[in-house]
Amino acid sequence: ASGFPPIAGIWTAVVGGIICSRLSNSQLTIKGPAAGLIVIVAGAVVELGTEFGANLPDAERAFLGYRLALGIGLAAGVLQVLLGAFRGGRLTELFPLTPIHGMLASIGVIIIAKQSYEVIGVAAPKGAGPLSLLAGLPGAVSQMNPEIAIIGGVSLLILFGLPLLPIPGIKKVPVQLVVLAVAIFMGMAFNLEHQHTYLFSSQFFRSGQAASFEVGPRFLVEMPEVLKAPASAFALPDFRGLGCMTGLKFLFLFTVIGSIESLLSAKAIELLDPWRRKTSFDRDLMAVGAANVLSSALGGLPMISEIVRSKANIDSGAK
């Protein structure tokens, strides 16, 4: 959804877990990639890629935009370190929670609009905005790929239904891992690893006539062959974006939105801490900034203190 490759999220999680846990005194917050920055990161990839590689093929332009966004992310990390050093943690006292909640809600709508097409196995219209994507969903449902839709539907049912079951200790089971295990098993059962065509008969498709659908590796997440080609797991930042207004715009957004959301998440988790420990928000901001510098240098996504994972951390008994 952000325009970054999947391996970028892994780098962010690894760097956040190692660096921030040593530098920050926020005991319970989980640092990593978050939905709150998806729209900004995706915008940076698209706009910077278009500005510096308008004549390139789509794949090359997207990769260039990715590298340019890494340069912006690294510079934003440096600014976050400086903000923390100059007592920028006081930003938590200046911004009310309501606009942040509104921003997060809008981001949720955008993610739903984009990923609903993926869940049912239909290609989303390129360049369409969230409202256009939502308006096109009814038509997309009539063209859905049944096997992919079954995997998506079962995964959502487990994700939202499993925690509601009245079974002792069920909430301590990481439901995301259950979803992942079930989805992998279903993907193997449907033989998604190999390109093939299957028939599906239903009143929903073509007036009850059996319809043919294609499935194959394109429905699987593409991961780089790290062991065969270690260099493919990394990407170097491109700093040319810092010399244009588009790049400076996203530098401001990366720094301010990332810092505010991270600080507010840390503040919320401080209130939930069963031991009532106090967090140094300046120190936490410096830790996030330092981790963002390293993450961007490796090819990772920008990170923040993530409220959902941090709350799950507390619910799982973290101290």
What annotation goes with each model-predicted range?
Residues 1-319:
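Transmembrane helical cores of multi-pass ion-transport proteins
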